[in-house]
């Protein structure tokens, strides 16, 4: 399975083509749109999300509600394009029109792709960089992940997410499955503990009032994963390596860990390794899950726990120092409409990126052209965990 996205932040649309989805999966566009709506929410979001009404149109690969096994194409319209039609249109414009453009960018933002991207592709107007490097592209990635979540549901695999930390204010590291699921989306910062939600909102408001931004930590959990997905044989087939690459490819994500993560460095091995137990009904399992469901680059049947670190968004309303690439003079960086905190929305993006990586790994492990074939192979692998 693979996908390719196209489109600019203020262009007419985002387009994504997904290849390798098995045939005969029932797809309802409202299920995908429900996930798209979640991405637009969260405390700290900017005005852009008040303009956009992200919905998906499926234009290929699905017939009468079922996947065909051929490439699936989805389109997300950018409603804000109506305000950018001349500036972001494909049609040529005159030099006079170009000179009169008010949205040409020559003052790169620290922490963004602006300057290095301009150098790499020889763009003197850095809008050509920021339009594609914008996190707006994650709308297309959420559409892909939503499609993958439908596939995972067919295999009785659950995936969900939450916010663990915003601006140094932390929720608990771990919750049991029942508590986690029962409290999803209970507040607009996506934390389980309501008592710290207001403290997070206050922290976001403080950053916004100061023209600043804040980051945080999100967590994704995958439950009922069959054992042995991934491989210890080669580095590029390790499941945790694939998930890690997917997570750090999300805009502004600067770190990833699994289970206890970096805290494992503080403890002895006897407190980190998960003891192996056996039950005749469920087979092998672990007495704990410090390693986050992954051993030797493979799933071990325990919940996969992924933690992602998001830095503060680099667009600041109190801009940092920069340099105009035309005059080489010192200037404050460009101010572009942005969020003060996108961590709650980023937890949704991370969930869907992980969903894609899990679905992709399953289809690599169990080469299947249709969902019935895939289901049978998953049943057999789960039985192996009991009979081995």
UniProtKB/Swiss-Prot annotation:
Any GO MF annotation of the entry: chorismate synthase activity
Class of enzymatic activity (EC top level): lyase
InterPro entries: Chorismate_synth (IPR000453), Chorismate_synth_AroC_sf (IPR035904), Chorismate_synthase_CS (IPR020541)
Family statement: Belongs to the chorismate synthase family.
Protein name according to UniProt: Chorismate synthase
Keywords, comma-separated and alphabetical: Amino-acid biosynthesis, Aromatic amino acid biosynthesis, FAD, Flavoprotein, FMN, Lyase, NADP
Keyword Amino-acid biosynthesis: yes
GO aspect biological process, one term: amino acid biosynthetic process
The keyword Nucleotide-binding belongs to this UniProt entry's keyword annotation: no
Subunit details: Homotetramer.
Pathway assigned to this chain's UniProt record: Metabolic intermediate biosynthesis; chorismate biosynthesis; chorismate from D-erythrose 4-phosphate and phosphoenolpyruvate: step 7/7
EC number(s) on file: 4.2.3.5
Required cofactor(s): FMNH2
């Amino acid at each position: 399975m693979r996908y390719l996205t196209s489109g600019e932040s203020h262009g007419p649309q985002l387009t994504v083509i997904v290849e390798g989805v098995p045939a005969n999966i029932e797809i309802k566009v409202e299920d995908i749109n429900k996930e798209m709506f979640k991405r637009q929410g969260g405390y700290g979001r900017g005005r852009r999300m008040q303009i956009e009404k992200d919905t998906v149109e499926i234009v290929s690969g699905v017939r009468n509600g079922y996947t065909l096994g051929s490439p699936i194409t989805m389109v997300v319209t950018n409603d804000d394009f109506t305000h950018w039609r001349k500036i972001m249109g494909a049609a040529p414009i005159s030099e006079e029109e170009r000179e009169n453009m008010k949205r040409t960018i020559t003052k790169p933002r620290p922490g963004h792709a602006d300057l290095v991207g301009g150098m790499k592709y020889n763009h003197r107007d850095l809008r050509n960089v920021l339009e594609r490097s914008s996190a707006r592209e994650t709308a297309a990635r959420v559409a892909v992940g939503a499609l993958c979540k439908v596939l995972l549901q067919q295999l009785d695999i659950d995936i969900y997410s939450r916010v663990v930390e915003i601006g140094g204010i932390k929720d608990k590291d771990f919750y049991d499955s029942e508590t986690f699921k029962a409290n999803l989306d209970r507040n607009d910062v996506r934390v389980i503990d309501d008592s710290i939600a207001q403290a997070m909102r206050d922290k976001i408001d403080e950053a916004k009032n100061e023209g600043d931004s804040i980051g945080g930590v999100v967590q994704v959990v995958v439950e009922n994963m069959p054992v042995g997905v991934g491989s210890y044989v080669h580095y590029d087939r390790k499941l945790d390596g694939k998930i890690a690459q997917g997570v750090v490819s999300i805009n502004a994500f600067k770190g990833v860990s699994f289970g206890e993560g970096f805290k494992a460095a503080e403890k002895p091995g006897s407190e980190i390794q998960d003891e192996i137990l056996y039950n005749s009904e469920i087979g092998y399992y672990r007495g704990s899950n410090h390693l986050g469901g992954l051993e030797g680059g493979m799933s071990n049947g325990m919940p996969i726990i992924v933690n992602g670190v998001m830095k503060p968004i680099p667009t600041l309303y109190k801009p940092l120092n920069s340099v105009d690439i035309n005059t080489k003079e010192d200037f404050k960086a460009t101010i572009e409409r942005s969020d003060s905190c996108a961590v709650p929305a980023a937890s949704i993006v991370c969930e869907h990126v992980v969903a894609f990586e899990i679905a992709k790994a399953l289809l690599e492990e169990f080469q299947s052209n249709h969902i019935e074939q895939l289901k049978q192979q998953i049943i057999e692998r789960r039985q192996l965990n009991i009979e081995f």
